[in-house]
Every structure is written in structure tokens, then in C-alpha cells.
Amino acid sequence: MARTILAFDFGTYSIGCAVGQDITGTAQGLPSFKAQDGIPNWDQIEKVIKEWQPERLVVGLPLNMDGSEQPLTQRAKKFANRLNGRFNLPVELQDERLTTVSAKAEIFERGGYKALKKDKVDSISACLILESWFEAQ
């Protein structure tokens, strides 16, 4: 039976979101959430969780290229803990190194420079995070 998973690309001003099913291993971008200094609109996130009814959540873990933590790493972990506390769903962290670079390259290939909108980048980054999580399972 297919399990629905939601993934988040945490950022201080925008949080990308994607949904996917483990049976296909593919993800689809959802609209990004605006955040104020890393604090999302929890009502919007709750709405998406109610709509998709995921069995688990995946949060991208921002790391430096050498694997060490960066200032955003702890904030992403805190966001993951809050998701777990608010929605009582299992939350896993997934290494997200290079997802933003890959997302920008993918968008640029499709639509050129004008297509590089922040919310699109965040949603595609969330897709890449989720697809890499599926591959690691």
C-alpha cells in the first residue's frame, strides 16, 4: 500500500513543500509557505497536512559541503521537532546539500532566467529532498 509523505525545504523567509508516495518514489511540488524569520504560518501547514494526510514528514537538513552543521541546521531541526510536536507525525531529516543549486538548474533549463522565482526554487528543492529520501529507503 502506498504511503503519502510530505517534505519541507526549511528557510527563514520561505519554506518549500512537496508531496509524494513511496510506491512511485516521485514528488510533486506544492505552493511554498511564507515564513517570518523561520516561523511559518502553522495554520497553512496544518491545512496541507489535513489535505494530504501524510504518514510521515521529511525535512531537509542544511549542511555544509563537508557535512558539518551551519547556522540554519539547528533551525531546521527545531522546525522538524515542532512539526512532530504539533501534528504527532514521524519526522525524518534528509541531507539537502546541493538541492537548491540543482533546483535552480532544473528551473533554468525549463524556462530560463525569468523562471527563477524563489517559491518555485523552494518547491523543487522540497521535491529533490523527498526524492533523495525515497532513494535512501
Curated annotation (Swiss-Prot):
SMART domains for the chain: YqgFc
Location(s), subcellular: Cytoplasm
Domain of life per record: Bacteria
Main location: cytoplasm
Known EC number: 3.1.-.-
GO CC aspect terms: cytosol
InterPro entries for this protein: RNaseH-like_sf, YqgF, YqgF/RNaseH-like_dom, YqgF/RNaseH-like_dom_sf
Keyword Nuclease attached: yes
GO molecular function: nuclease activity
Key words, A-Z: Cytoplasm, Hydrolase, Nuclease, Ribosome biogenesis
GO biological process, alphabetically ordered: rRNA 5'-end processing
Functional note: Could be a nuclease involved in processing of the 5'-end of pre-16S rRNA.
Family membership: Belongs to the YqgF nuclease family.
Protein name (database record): Putative pre-16S rRNA nuclease
Protein source organism: Actinobacillus pleuropneumoniae serotype 5b (strain L20)
Taxon lineage: Bacteria, Pseudomonadati, Pseudomonadota, Gammaproteobacteria, Pasteurellales
